[in-house]
Amino acid sequence: MQRAFNIASLKVTVIGAARSGLAAARLLHQKGVTVFLTELSPAESYPEAAAILANERIPHEFGGHSDRMYESDLIVVSPGVPSDAPVLLEAERRGMPVISEIEVGAMFIDGPIIAVTGTNGKTTTTTLAGEICKASGRNTLVGGNIGLAFTDALLVHPLPVDITVLEVSSFQLDTCVSFHPSTAIITTITPDHLNRYHGSFQEYVASKQRIFMNQNAQDNLIYSQDNPVVEHAVKTARARLFPVSVQQRLSRGGWRENGHLMIDAGFGGEVLVRVEDLQVRGAHNHMNVLMAALAARLEGIPIDVIRQAVLEFRGVEHRLEFVIELDGGTW
């Protein structure tokens, strides 16, 4: 993981006392970094965070942003803070670097990172990729925009981490500077959250493209070839490209063929599973499975381990889940 900052030598301001901001401040404080947290809302809005900050003696303020926040070398921003917030515009005017909580977590990870973004499918893909990595016996951290915030997970997860699997939102990517996943996945891109991007779909696409901006020819980028926006977006990538399709057979990446899911991560075409043996149904889930399996294979996990984890995967809670076939229907 390349690091743009020697964080230990810096004074850092964290904006926002919600879960990711609080976690970032706590992690930095535990690592010996001089940190200050500032929150616009009053302490009554975040009683648990206020108590934790006081108990752990982390300097902080609630109810507004004082000039103290600019007495630092670096600003860490929560994903809920829009890029055009006055405090961030002022930081930009002062020439202060601003990074995301995701990037803070990555500074304390040495192993490979699988990062997943996309409008739809990223939670299922992230969850399955994490399950596969765990099944391989690797010490696997799963977090980001799913479950625990990345820095929160690092507070409780035993170190060292062998491999990290992250769900990353466009909001988190907006302020990434040196974030460098060894394997990145873009599931889909369709219009979403455009109010955050001044109504511009192109700005939203550009945010998703940031997941691969620091990748090089030794890294991997998995993407949906069935989504024209994604297919066009990855043309600027420097990483090795691995397309995935459920509509056509491919020469590398992942695809459906004769009732099977197939992957080729550079080891030749490998049969992953029969579609009928999956516990998750639908073309969208076939795409998610192919992407997660391909990412794991690219990170060196044996195909038999991947296959077994895929067959056992029942999907994500509150998502579409197969129950039974009855009276000619699927429920």
What are these regions (language model features)?
Residues 1-100, 104, 281, 308:
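N-terminal leader/targeting and accessory segments in enzymes
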Residues 24, 125-129, 295:
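Hydrophobic residues within alpha-helices
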Residues 18, 41-43, 146, 227, ...:
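Residues in the short beta-alpha loop(s) of Rossmann-like NAD(P)-binding domains
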Residues 30, 68-70, 79-225, 229-238, ...:
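Phosphate-binding loop of NTP-binding sites
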Residues 3, 10, 15-17, 198-205, ...:
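Adenine nucleotide phosphate-binding catalytic loops in nucleotide-utilizing enzymes
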Residues 47-52, 113, 152-157, 321-323:
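Active-site-proximal loop->helix
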Residues 34-39, 141-142, 165, 243:
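Short beta-strand "acidic-cap" motif of Rossmann-like dinucleotide-binding folds
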